[in-house]
């Protein structure tokens, strides 16, 4: 059976809306899943793994815990990046548009791989991103150059320096 990208997006938007996601949030979440799936990051498998959790918890947004000149800390309150990833990327992007560079740590969040789509989309505004997170027994580093349509995806084993459920993002005009 063949299904178009538009049909997948429409179905996922309805599914996320049924889970309690707000307009805008369910658009972004559907985009994240489809982008990962169409670019070889197994978006549907990742969604299936988290669906039970999403179905049993109310959607919550991240809280700003700390802010200084170039750094932010957001608390995801145990939610998925499908819900709080867009606001994290929008926050760091808006800070970089006003200055030179910024860093953001999103703590207490899950499904961090979904952030890749948001970083790629934001990179289309000539911004560069580097993101780090821990995934099971390894760490992931994603680099996105300004204007890039695909990330550079690397894994490494420095587990002790990356918290289990956190995501670190750095953004600038070039990194």
What are these regions (language model features)?
Residues 1-17:
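Generic N-terminal amphipathic, Lys/Arg-enriched alpha-helix
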Residues 14-21, 34-42, 97, 124-127:
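Generic secondary-structure signature for well-ordered alpha-helical cores
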Residues 50-162:
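A glycine-rich, acidic short-motif signal
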Residues 2, 6, 23-27, 41, ...:
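Electropositive phosphate-/nucleotide-binding environments in soluble metabolic enzymes
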Residues 170-175:
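A structured, mid-to-C-terminal "fold-capping" secondary-structure block
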Residues 13, 25-72:
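N-terminal low-complexity or amphipathic/hydrophobic leaders
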